[in-house]
Amino acid sequence: MSALLREEDLNDFITPEVACIKPVSSKPSNGVDGELSVGKEPEKVEISLADCLACVGCITSSEEILLSRQNQDVFVKEWNEKKTEGYILSVSIAPQCRVSLSQYFGMGVLKFDQMFIRYLQEVWGARYVVGIQEGREESIKLMNEVADKGERKICSACPGFLMYCEKKQQDLLPLLIDVKSPMEITGHLLKDGNKEKMYHLSIMPCFDKKLESMRPESIGLVDCVITPKELVNLITPEQVDKYFATTKETIGMLEWEDAIQRVTPKWMNIDTSFKTNEGSSSGGFAWQYILHRRFQMSDNDNDNAYKIETVRGRNLDVTEFRLIDEEGKILVRSTQVFGFRNIQNLRRLVKDVKPRKLKRFIRKRPTANGNDNSISLSSSINNQDNNNTKVEEPVDFCKSDFLEVMACPRGCIAGGGNLKNGIKNGPDQDSDPNQDLNTVYMTSIPMTSIEPRHNLTLPSSQENVIVGVISHDLDDSNTIIKLQEEQKYGNKYKRKLYNPSSISETHNGDSKNTIEQPVQFTTW
């Protein structure tokens, strides 16, 4: 990273006594207690720059205060107060956390879901327990629609990457898709449909989600965020024996669905909540975008006209999906970019691209009746002619129409709040625990498909306009799509991106700059 110190970096401080919070695991000793080993030096502990970005442990003073308001002790204290005031408890949990906790307790994911719901109901009195899939589906659909307009192309539900852009790489902000994360939209779905006072606890794989819940546009959607590492501290040994004792017992889909149905709000989708979609264990945004574009371009009579090819990058954390026509030409690309090293490469490549090259173009294809049907596609960032692009080309971030970025190597399944080892026996030392969790994620959580948003009824004069697909001969098509989005969603699902240089400085002695006004903090 650059050693240069910029003026805007000086408007906050890190307290001197704050040490790195990155946990360091130690290998068990084979010696007897009290026995000294001569001639061996202890191994030096190394924490890489990649760890630091994913961890965001070196937090500012304001972020330290915010984080202190989001932990398991705060949840216990606040919920004990709120329930006496007539509040109901709702809990949302990310699928990565369900996988991590199920492996920690040594049971299958479906069995864990059943026992976890029972634990929350009997111990904490939870009224509703939901997954975040419905919120994720709304997030994916909206991100696809924003990306279709061609101005923004970087998608990230990762608060670590978002804060990195806002603090250090403001030049990337115009490319970020301004849609809220699945956690935040789940908060909207829970609270907007409920008439009672609700306390919302969310269990997330990443500590940075705590800061995300305190963003100005998200305050009130999630009342407290904890991670699996903090959740297990709430569970007593007696409760482990009662609810989470290691077992090979499995349950069927009907029993699993029955458990979910009892705790799903009537205004949310029972069939979706605890499932997941195709793609990666981080949400599959890049994969879903390429499916979305294939749907737009495919004829009902010829669904096999386009195929999707997966191309690996130089390391496991870069994957590109390519939509290819029958002649082998690449039409659309979407790319997964995980980990700090790849983010640095992305930053260097995208930083040099001039804004004038962010254009849109129209690709025409014949329809079944022989007429031309124009579909608007996002151009590659360097506006190259995709007709001349060959399938054999290596992965190139600058040619991608859609980028899914996560700070952690391996993505959200490797979030810092997830548990790495089981309650009794950890995974094989020679295996990659993140890869193990990824395999469990993709094979154990029931899958659901995301229906394309194409069924809105339009006036006959606009019959050739579909949400996210713009006909070139309609001058007011952008207005139509904007009105459709605002009619269905308003602006509540939009993300506000903050550039520190545009935020007014905090003046000494100004008592108004408190936690209750987070926009005044230099956190964002």
UniProtKB/Swiss-Prot annotation:
InterPro entries: Cytosolic_Fe-S_CAF, Fe_hydrogenase, Fe_hydrogenase_lsu_C. One of its GO terms (biological process) is iron-sulfur cluster assembly. [4Fe-4S] cluster 2 binds at residues 158, 206, 408, 412. It holds the Pfam family Fe_hyd_lg_C. [4Fe-4S] cluster 1 binds at residues 20, 52, 55, 58. Gene3D superfamilies: 3.40.50.1780, Fe-only Hydrogenase (Larger Subunit), Chain L, domain 3 (3.40.950.10). One of its GO terms (molecular function) is metal ion binding. This is Cytosolic Fe-S cluster assembly factor NAR1. It comes from Vanderwaltozyma polyspora (strain ATCC 22028 / DSM 70294 / BCRC 21397 / CBS 2163 / NBRC 10782 / NRRL Y-8283 / UCD 57-17). The gene is NAR1.
